[in-house]
């Protein structure tokens, strides 16, 4: 189930994004990005609709994933 990020408290959203960034360990290429830059990049992607917040009822977890992947059914078991 997609969770509307706009309805979350800003501090809660920041914590969710930070947790995701730290958990994912995303590679940003040759130049290393700070945590703040990575968080801002994910926030930008949420605002543009590139990624969505997804709640898994099965696992009772929240994840951030590309909208295309969610729409294609790649969200299972989310």
Swiss-Prot record:
<protein>
    <recommendedName>
        <fullName>UPF0270 protein PC1_3850</fullName>
    </recommendedName>
</protein>
<dbReference type="Pfam" id="PF06794">
    <property type="entry name" value="UPF0270"/>
</dbReference>
<dbReference type="InterPro" id="IPR036685">
    <property type="entry name" value="YehU-like_sf"/>
</dbReference>
<comment type="similarity">
    <text>Belongs to the UPF0270 family.</text>
</comment>
<dbReference type="InterPro" id="IPR010648">
    <property type="entry name" value="UPF0270"/>
</dbReference>
